[in-house]
């Protein structure tokens, strides 16, 4: 199974990806996480340091693939999760999609690409071009990390559009949304009501998730000494269980930009209207209510 994790820049994709990878490993799967970001920091919380990138290694070998060995590019991280960083072209030059393609090509040359039960691609920020949508060419499922805010859901909607485009020629589906570090989910629920897709999990707004990234440790590793964090790991184990059940997934139809803007802004600008809609759905007339608290 191959997974591609997308979401708005800074939403917490790498932290989420690392913990999902460990959760899958805890379920007995052999897992490879591939960081697809020029910052090459996707696997930092698994390995504890910035590992050399595929591009750096290929450059040092003058792009002689036959001179590259698995141990040159694959590093084992916490929980037995193997880690690879694709890296990227210099700032302002080159194409990130090319780098992803070179990474997959090299792993195939090393007979490593098909040795894993699960390969997880952790992809940088919003989908801004076809190049950064390249991991979708290899994925069975796309996981979209969001929060309960407009910007993250706007980015999620653009990612949905990319999935729909790729699904024309690839057996690709959206596995679902993961809400990251949010106490509320009203906008998430509003979005999936209009653009139906599963919500795999909504992670609580706790500092331990943010701090784990700064520490360079996953929540599973922190939980070994801080048992109070253990309950958060259960969220990721639940995500892993859903993914391993090989869900049908969906190919949603994205909303138009203005339609999405109106949908989400109207939710707060016209709360009474939304309450009336909810009352009608439940079979109640708004006038029959004794009072309404907004």
Swiss-Prot record:
Required cofactor(s): [4Fe-4S] cluster
Transmembrane segments: none
Record's keyword terms, sorted: 4Fe-4S, ATP-binding, Chlorophyll biosynthesis, Chloroplast, Iron, Iron-sulfur, Magnesium, Metal-binding, Nucleotide-binding, Oxidoreductase, Photosynthesis, Plastid
EC number, as in UniProt: 1.3.7.7
Pfam families per UniProt: Fer4_NifH
Any one GO BP annotation for this protein: photosynthesis, dark reaction
Primary localization: plastid
Positions of ATP binding: 10-15, 39, 180-181
Cofactor note: Binds 1 [4Fe-4S] cluster per dimer.
Record text on subunit structure and interactions: Homodimer. Protochlorophyllide reductase is composed of three subunits; ChlL, ChlN and ChlB.
Function of the molecule: Component of the dark-operative protochlorophyllide reductase (DPOR) that uses Mg-ATP and reduced ferredoxin to reduce ring D of protochlorophyllide (Pchlide) to form chlorophyllide a (Chlide). This reaction is light-independent. The L component serves as a unique electron donor to the NB-component of the complex, and binds Mg-ATP.
Protein name, as recorded: Light-independent protochlorophyllide reductase iron-sulfur ATP-binding protein
Organism: Pleurastrum terricola (Filamentous green alga)
Lineage summary: Eukaryota, Viridiplantae, Chlorophyta, core chlorophytes, Chlorophyceae
Gene symbol of the encoding locus: chlL
């Amino acid at each position: 199974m191959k997974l591609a994790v997308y979401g708005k820049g800074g939403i917490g994709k790498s932290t989420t990806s690392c913990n999902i990878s460990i959760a899958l490993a805890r379920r007995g799967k052999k897992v490879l996480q591939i960081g697809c970001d020029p910052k090459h920091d996707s696997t930092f919380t698994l390995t504890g340091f910035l590992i050399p990138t595929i591009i750096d290694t290929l450059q040092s070998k003058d792009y002689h693939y036959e001179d590259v060995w698995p141990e040159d590019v694959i590093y084992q991280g916490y929980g037995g999760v193997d880690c690879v960083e694709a890296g990227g072209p210099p700032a302002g030059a080159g194409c990130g999609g090319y780098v992803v393609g070179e990474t997959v090509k090299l792993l195939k040359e090393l007979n490593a690409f098909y040795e894993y039960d699960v390969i997880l691609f952790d992809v940088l920020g919003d989908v801004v071009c076809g190049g950064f949508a390249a991991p979708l060419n290899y994925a069975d499922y796309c996981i979209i990390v969001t929060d309960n805010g407009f910007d993250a859901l706007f980015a999620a909607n653009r990612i949905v559009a990319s999935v729909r485009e790729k699904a024309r020629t690839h057996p690709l589906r959206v596995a679902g949304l993961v809400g990251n570090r949010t106490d509320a989910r009203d906008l998430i629920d509003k979005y999936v009501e209009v653009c139906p897709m599963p919500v795999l999990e909504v992670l609580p707004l706790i500092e331990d998730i943010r701090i784990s990234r700064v520490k360079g440790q996953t929540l599973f590793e922190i939980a070994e000494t801080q048992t109070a964090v253990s309950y958060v790991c259960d969220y990721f184990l639940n995500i892993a269980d859903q993914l391993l059940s090989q869900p049908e997934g969906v190919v949603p139809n994205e909303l138009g930009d203005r339609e999405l803007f109106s949908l989400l802004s109207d939710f707060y600008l016209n709360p009474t209207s939304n309450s009336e809609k909810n009352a009608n759905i439940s079979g109640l007339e708004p006038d029959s209510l004794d009072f309404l608290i907004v």
